[in-house]
């Protein structure tokens, strides 16, 4: 039997999803939608695009009427904001909003869409985690009036988020600014504080 039995069982082709992401993290963006309920119980839809390598939110918009055109235009503007440096891959789920028109415009930048499996939010874990952070640290603590108000709040929070240390970046901030701990203890009077979102958060730095 040993003569006819294969020495090794056949393995599945290709690499694991986690391995693929790790190998291409600096070339990959991820996109997803989430909902926001206003003070008047209107449902708004926020669209977020995340650079996985930098953990940077490259685009975040809010609209009462989500569409493929809105999603595609958000991607285009994100690429232009990066001086035409488009990612190699874009991860998104199977929502019908990512239809032929969306994929065509994304492909025009040389970007390949990677569609996650059905009912598998963990396949877009980086984006899901950022959305969770936006909810817990921002939206769950404010009353949103409308889409313009939601965008203003989120823009202010994103500026704060991009400037604080991130564990996934070895305690460096997503905005790329090099952060180093002080060589010696800083006296309390040497620390300045900046209020974020009316005091919901505070950003700290060394006073000039």
Regions of interest found by a model, annotated:
Residues 1-208:
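Charged DNA-binding/catalytic regions of mobile-element recombinases
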């Amino acid at each position: 039997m040993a003569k006819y039995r294969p020495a090794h069982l056949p393995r599945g082709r290709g690499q694991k999803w986690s391995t693929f992401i790790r190998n291409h993290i600096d070339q990959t963006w991820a996109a997803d939608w989430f909902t926001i309920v206003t003070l008047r119980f209107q449902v708004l839809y926020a669209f977020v695009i995340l650079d996985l390598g930098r953990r940077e939110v490259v685009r975040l918009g809010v609209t009462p009427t989500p569409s493929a055109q809105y999603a595609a235009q958000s991607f285009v503007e994100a690429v232009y904001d990066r001086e035409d440096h488009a990612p190699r891959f874009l991860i998104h789920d199977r929502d019908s909003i990512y239809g032929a028109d969306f994929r065509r415009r994304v492909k025009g930048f040389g970007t390949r869409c990677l569609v996650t499996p059905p009912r598998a939010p963990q396949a877009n874990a980086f984006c899901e985690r950022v959305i969770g952070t936006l909810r817990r640290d921002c939206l769950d603590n404010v009353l949103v009036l409308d889409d313009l108000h939601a965008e203003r709040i989120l823009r202010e929070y994103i500026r704060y988020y991009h400037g604080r240390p991130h564990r996934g970046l070895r305690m460096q901030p997503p905005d790329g600014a090099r952060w180093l701990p002080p060589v010696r203890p800083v006296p309390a009077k040497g620390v300045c504080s900046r209020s974020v979102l009316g005091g919901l958060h505070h950003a700290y730095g060394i006073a000039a």
